[in-house]
Amino acid sequence: FYAGLILTLVNTFPYNISPASS
């Protein structure tokens, strides 16, 4: 699974998908 890829993506722009990450 692309867990690392997804994590990196979410870490790059989490405000674009889920603005719940501070």
From Swiss-Prot:
Protein name (database record):
50 kDa cell wall protein
Q: Which GO terms describe its cellular component?
A: extracellular region
Compartment(s) of residence: Secreted, Cell wall
Q: Which organism is it from?
A: Nicotiana tabacum
For this UniProt entry, what is the primary localization, expressed as one broad class?
secreted
Identify the domain of life.
Eukaryota
Q: Which UniProt keywords apply?
A: Cell wall, Secreted
